[in-house]
Amino acid sequence: RKAVLADVEAIVKLVNMAYRGESSRSGWTTEADILDGLRTSVNEVERLIASENTIVLLCLNDDELLGSICLEKEAKIEKALSIAHIGMFVVNPMKQANGIGKRLLAEAERLAQHMWDIEKFQMHVITIRPELIAFYERRGYMLTGIVSDFPVNPDVWQPKLDGLQLETLEKIISK
């Protein structure tokens, strides 16, 4: 289901637990050896949920939050493909490797295509995460060769390694 403001605390807790710190090490998506600090904040998730161009989708088992994913619709430029950016994609580390992420990503793509008529999905992945890049490649995403420096945000996170970079991956949807 789509997230609402009442879900913010649970989303922030799950995202930070899955990406950073010791709790993230039980899953394969940890960034604990790459980054210190938080992955997200209450303010960021509230802003995303409140935005009309964003969907935060939740995966629940009864009331247990298993995963979430954020889709942000890019403003369409004349004759360009309509694009949705995927981010803050997470599955509880204790529940990973059970197909939840595959199903959540597929449902997010389906929903974005239905609601926004999306023709291309984009995301940014840390270049030193080959296992994560491979996961997305198996789902039809391709490396674009577009690489950028990892963003600096010392109030929230701090890189443990110098020279971190992000690569843009994309998936074009045939109509």
Annotate each predicted stretch with a short phrase:
Residues 16-45:
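Conserved GNAT-fold acetyl-CoA-binding loop/helix
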Residues 58, 89-97, 125-126:
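A short, internal acetyl-CoA/4′-phosphopantetheine-binding micro-motif in the GNAT/acyltransferase core
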Residues 58, 64-73, 85-90:
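Conserved beta-strand in the GNAT
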Residues 103-120, 142:
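Conserved acyl-CoA
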Residues 119-175:
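C-terminal "cap" of GNAT-fold acetyltransferases
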Residues 1-13, 20-21:
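A short beta-loop-alpha structural element at the N-terminal edge
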Residues 39-57, 162-165:
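A short helix-loop-beta-strand connector motif used in the catalytic cores of GNAT acetyltransferases and
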Residues 91, 97-110, 134, 138:
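Conserved acetyl-CoA-binding loop-helix of GNAT-fold acetyltransferases
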